[in-house]
Swiss-Prot record:
This is RAS guanyl-releasing protein 1. SUPFAM superfamilies: Cysteine-rich domain, EF-hand, Ras GEF. It comes from Homo sapiens (Human). Signal peptide: none annotated. Residues 470-505, 506-532 form the EF-hand domain. The modification Phosphothreonine is found at T184. Residues 57-110 are annotated as: Ras exchanger motif region. Expressed in brain with higher expression in cerebellum, cerebral cortex and amygdala. Expressed in the hematopoietic system. Expressed in T-cells (at protein level). Expressed in NK cells (at protein level). CDD domains: C1_RASGRP1 (cd20860), cc_RasGRP1_C (cd22290), RasGEF (cd00155), REM (cd06224). It comes from the Eukaryota. Pfam families: C1_1, RasGEF, RasGEF_N. The gene is RASGRP1. Belongs to the RASGRP family. The keyword Transcription regulation does not apply.
Length: 797
């Protein structure tokens, strides 16, 4: 679990009054203490509180602590002494006793006071409970057992007829409170900038990027409440602690985003530019005193997937490497983060700490000090120390950040950081960018010299609702800034620039109008990309195996040719899909496992059976073929251009990151193997040609690629997509509105007729199913009778 893993390898055993054991545990921490040598504000506050508590600071029984809290109130309900003991007791009591058990002890004291006819003590007990409800009312909303015990107390007081006491311990106002911890600072549009706010990564200044990352970090940090820190200590993990889980996901997401943005550039020079930009972002984060995001950025740049890029590092100036070394030294874990602790202690006003380091301190303190001292006394010193450290973190949330955030850029970054990669996947991309030298020993993913994934054992949970919300907000911001004529479309160039700000490397877009992208299309793009990378989309993953193809084969994912002599690509053992190495993790189609004994229809019977069904399915997804004529299926069926033909643009950003706009025509049929031999250049086959044209070739020099014929023993795998690439003037590709208006759509009567036909077919199938079930039952009955008859014959013989 990263930094915290060692502290959580074994479950904590509660110690009850063993002085020798407690001394051994305390002496186990020599000079390398988790706390800085110089006194901090928390230590000074702790010393003052110890003095104010007097004899209780050395340890006291639980009953004495409860009695001291009750006696803190006078007859009118006012505090007659410091509230420090009340604060410590009501916030940290869960370390030694649950909230319901503490309230049960208070109820017992109330019953004893009633029995002794002591109304003054009963009133003070109710004042204590009222203080608990008023100051820490969140406990009563989150703890079901505490709520049930409180209801028992209210029923007891009501049964005794004490109306004043009932009003004091009333909890009905809790439900009226807005207990969600939302960021009070409103996001304002950055109107101080003269230029238009850019949503493009390449146009963002390091200062802008660092400010908005700080805003997101502070927004997440501010939502971690006092009880969240306490729950982390008591439960020993961040499960069932959503605010802390989100903080972990943000920190790890920023680190992955930094790595992927560097690796998304195709050349070493461009990768070096992104690397330099993130170093400048780190410098700005240091100036803003945002150490948590600084740790994430530097950790991402120091990760082995980036540090191994020798060609990229050769383009990084010496001054930048020097700054990286200084930042790494600042955040180094040597001497228990002594450099960071010194720098953090010197900071004033707004600052965001490295949360993992301070949580490690809390765990060290929680594990090192016993809960109880000798004679069963509660270790008040431990409660005070934990209370002061948590309070110091909570007080940082009250200082507003010295920056102004732009709502649109916040939405863009929020979606960009929704990443769900593993280290192996990132390292694979790094190896694809710069293959390792065969003479050098193979590298494996290693941890950076600074701690980033301080709780790497906790992986963010991809939530479809959250992703959908982030996508919708980002799309609204994109059209607000780039849809100038407000017609609901943005240009292809603008979309490609925006998409370059994300580490998504491949996705398919259906376009209503060539050259323009609508709101629905860009929403579908990011939703599909997010679902792919958050592992939400594929319910049945493929079982890809590296394969050597003996005949020409195309990738079923990107329609590209599988080049090479041996091991050209990957083939799914279950469904037979073929793809490139870089495409196998980007497949959006689920694995459709083949039947063991498929029924092979004859070549002549092409109008019925699975072949015709697959062809009719494939016809709905057909794309424009050459304009000279209809595209012909390999089995001889031709499909004319019509309303069922759709344009599709595929963004290809593979290892070379070269974007190619493809117009695809998907041929769907059964075939025996993915590697059928086919004529490449020459005469037309019976099925018709597949044209690949280029501006450098004349009409006579056009390359014709013929589809392969149908095999007599087809497999249920769909034929690979074939790409029709055309280099043309973009203006000639834009369809006019008149053409779109003339597209024929089915009438209501035609749809109604088709529905009735399908219903009739469905009814007929139901009748056949019932007949088959009855036939099965009769055969089973005959079988059982036959078995009984054989048994009777055996007995007679």
């Amino acid at each position: 679990m990263g930094t915290l893993g060692k502290a959580r390898e074994a479950p904590r055993k509660p110690s009850h009054g063993c002085r020798a054991a407690s001394k051994a545990r305390l002496e186990a921490k020599p000079a390398n203490s988790p706390f800085p040598s110089h006194p901090s504000l928390a230590h000074i506050t702790q010393f003052r509180m110890m003095v104010s508590l007097g004899h209780l600071a050395k340890g006291a029984s639980l009953d004495d602590l409860i009695d001291s809290c009750i006696q803190s109130f006078d007859a009118d309900g006012n505090l007659c002494r410091s509230n420090q003991l009340l604060q410590v007791m009501l916030t940290m009591h869960r370390i030694v006793i649950s909230s319901a058990e503490l309230l049960q002890k208070v109820i017992t004291l109330y019953k004893d006071a009633l029995a002794k006819n002591s109304p003054g003590l009963c009133l003070k007990i109710c004042y204590f409970v009222r203080y608990w409800i008023t100051e820490f009312w969140v406990m009563f909303k989150m703890d079901a057992s505490l709520t049930d015990t409180m209801e028992e107390f209210q029923e007891l007081v009501k049964a005794k007829g004490e109306e004043l006491h009932c009003r004091l311990i009333d909890t009905t106002q809790i439900n009226a409170r807005d207990w969600s911890r939302k960021l009070t600072q409103r996001i304002k549009s950055n109107t101080s900038k003269k230029r238009k706010v850019s949503l493009l990564f390449d146009h963002l200044e390091p200062e802008e990027l660092s400010e908005h990352l700080t805003y997101l970090e502070f927004k997440s940090f501010r939502r971690i409440s006092f009880s969240d820190y306490q729950n982390y200590l008591v439960n020993s993990c961040v499960k069932e602690n959503p605010t802390m889980e989100r903080s972990i996901a943000l920190c790890n997401g920023i680190s992955q985003w930094v790595q992927l943005m560097v690796l998304s550039r195709p050349t070493p020079q461009l990768r070096a530019e992104v690397f330099i930009k993130f170093i400048q972002v780190a410098q700005k984060l240091h100036q803003l005193q945002n150490f948590n995001t600084l740790m994430a950025v530097i950790g991402g740049l120091c990760h082995s997937s980036i540090s191994r890029l020798k060609e990229t590092s050769s383009h990084v100036p010496h001054e930048i490497n020097k700054v990286l070394g200084e930042m790494t030294e600042l955040l180094s874990s040597s001497r228990n983060y002594d450099n960071y602790r010194r720098a953090y202690g010197e900071c004033t006003d707004f600052k965001i700490p490295i949360l993992g380091v301070h949580l490690k301190d809390l765990i060290s303190l929680y594990e090192a000090m016993p809960d109880y001292l000798e004679d069963g006394k509660v270790n008040v010193h431990k409660l005070l120390a934990l209370y002061n450290h948590i309070s110091e973190l909570v007080q940082l949330q009250e200082v507003a950040p010295p920056l102004e955030a732009n709502k649109d850029l916040v939405h863009l970054l929020t979606l960009s950081l929704d990443l769900y990669y593993t280290e192996d996947e990132i390292y694979e991309l790094s190896y694809a960018r710069e293959p390792r030298n065969h003479r050098a020993p193979p590298l494996t993913p290693s941890k950076p010299p600074v701690v980033v994934d301080w709780a790497s054992g906790v992986s963010p949970k991809p939530d479809p609702k959250t992703i959908s919300k982030h996508v919708q907000r980002m799309v609204d911001s994109v059209f607000k800034n780039y849809d100038h004529d407000q017609d609901g479309y943005i240009s292809q160039e603008e979309f490609e620039k925006i998409a370059a700000s994300f580490p998504f490397s491949f996705c398919v877009m259906d376009k209503d109008r060539e050259g323009l992208i609508s709101r629905d299309e860009i929403t579908a793009y990011f939703m599909r990309a997010s679902s792919i990378y958050s592992k939400l989309g594929l319910g049945f993953p493929h079982n890809f195996q590296e394969t050597t193809y003996l005949k020409p084969t195309f990738c079923d994912n990107c329609a590209g040719f599988l080049w090479g002599v041996i091991k050209q690509g990957y083939r799914c053992k279950d469904c037979g899909m073929n793809c490139h190495k870089q495409c196998k993790d980007l497949v959006v189609f689920e694995c459709k496992k083949r039947a063991k004994n498929p029924v092979a229809p004859t070549e002549n019977n092409t109008s019925v059976g699975p072949v015709s069904n697959l062809c009719s399915l494939g016809a709905k997804d057909l794309l424009h073929a050459p304009e000279e004529g209809p595209f012909t299926f390999p089995n001889g069926e031709a499909v004319e251009h019509g309303e069922e033909s759709k344009d599709r643009t595929i963004m290809l950003m593979g290892v070379s990151s070269q974007k190619i706009s493809l117009r695809l025509k998907r041929a769907v049929a059964h075939k025996a193997t993915q590697t059928e031999s086919q004529p490449w250049i020459g005469s037309e086959g019976p099925s018709g040609p597949f044209v690949l044209s280029s501006p450098r070739k004349t009409a006579q020099d056009t390359l014709y690629v013929l589809p392969s014929p149908t095999s007599p023993c087809p497999s249920p795998v769909l034929v690979r997509k074939r790409a029709f690439v055309k280099w043309e003037n973009k203006d000639s590709l834009i369809k006019s509105k008149e053409e779109l208006r003339h597209l024929r759509l089915p009438t209501y009567q035609e749809l109604e007729q088709e529905i009735n036909t399908l219903k009739a077919d469905n009814d007929a199938l139901k009748i056949q199913l019932k007949y088959a079930q009855k036939k099965i039952e009769s055969l089973q009955l005959e079988k059982s009778n036959h078995v009984l008859a054989q048994m009777e014959q055996g007995d007679c013989s």
